Amino acid sequence: MPSEVLDLGTPQPKQVEFLTDTHNVVAFGGARGGGKSWVVDCKAKVMSYACPGITQIIVRKTYPELTENHIVPLTRALQCYHPDRHRRLAVYNDSKKTITFPNGSRILFRYLEREKDLGRFQGTECDIMYLDEATQFTEDMFKTLWACVRGTNSHPKRMYLTCNPGGVGHQWVKRLFIDRVYDENENPEDCLLYTSDAA
């Protein structure tokens, strides 16, 4: 058993609201430096401990962005490379791009640069997915990824987004969270947006 205690840091008030929200699709908006990637990593760590065996996926557009904003900070916070294995809070498998916790929880890291790459997500199943910088993705990408959030276990099934104004996905993000105009198969009660205190 790891002998270390995880320090989650101190979230800002809006980050606390995002972290404790239980809507099915929760978005966190704000400018650069607003703590969007940090809040994703924090939520992923909390859920990994709170729900043993849970599977979570963090998605960014490119692998370098994924590495810089999530893999490096999370493996560092969880001391995945500590020379004393008893102080490691989790194990990182670079070939599988997966962090595994002693309780069986997993955080998977995936990138999605183009719509033609969606085939790589065929058959993918997870309990929670994080779409970081969601406005960089098309609506078809979002809907395909949202369909991966499923399963028969008792874990919560949610999608968390972070977003900035602009980008190829600006209109669908605005439709869901600002204009709140929904298609026939969408539930207005599923979606909620928080904005960063630093925005």
Regions found by a protein language model. Give the residues of each.
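Phosphate/NTP-binding elements of NTP-utilizing enzymes
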Residues: 1-196
